[in-house]
């Protein structure tokens, strides 16, 4: 499962969500909510309250005469029980 998690997302919005005890990850498109919830609870030993996921739209990119699209990915936002935290995101 660890190979399906690409990276933690640290954007302006995700940093604001850290104050609400919500953590954002970029994962492969084939990951579903239930297996990701089990993985987070086992790996980080925290209690997950809810999980939201979305697949942002592709953006059109152009380099010279060649045009294409960015790679699709899935973003998962994990809400933890108050008092729990993931040390990976400690700023």
Curated annotation (Swiss-Prot):
It is found in: Plastid, Chloroplast. Keywords: Chloroplast, Plastid, Ribonucleoprotein, Ribosomal protein, RNA-binding, rRNA-binding. GO terms for cellular component: chloroplast; ribonucleoprotein complex; ribosome. Disulfide bonds: none annotated. GO terms for biological process: translation. SUPFAM superfamilies: Ribosomal proteins S24e, L23 and L15e (SSF54189). It comes from the Eukaryota. Belongs to the universal ribosomal protein uL23 family. Part of the 50S ribosomal subunit. Binds to 23S rRNA. PANTHER family: 60S RIBOSOMAL PROTEIN L23A. This is Large ribosomal subunit protein uL23c. It comes from Chaetosphaeridium globosum. The gene is rpl23.
């Amino acid at each position: 499962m660890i190979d399906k998690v690409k990276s933690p997302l640290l954007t302006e919005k995700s940093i604001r969500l850290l104050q609400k005890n919500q953590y954002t990850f970029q994962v492969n498109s084939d990951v579903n909510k239930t297996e990701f919830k089990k993985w987070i609870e086992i790996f980080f030993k925290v209690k997950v309250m809810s999980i939201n996921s979305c697949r942002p739209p592709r953006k059109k990119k152009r380099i010279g005469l060649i045009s294409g699209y960015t790679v699709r990915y899935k973003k998962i936002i994990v809400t933890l029980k108050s008092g729990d935290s993931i040390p990976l995101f400690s700023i």
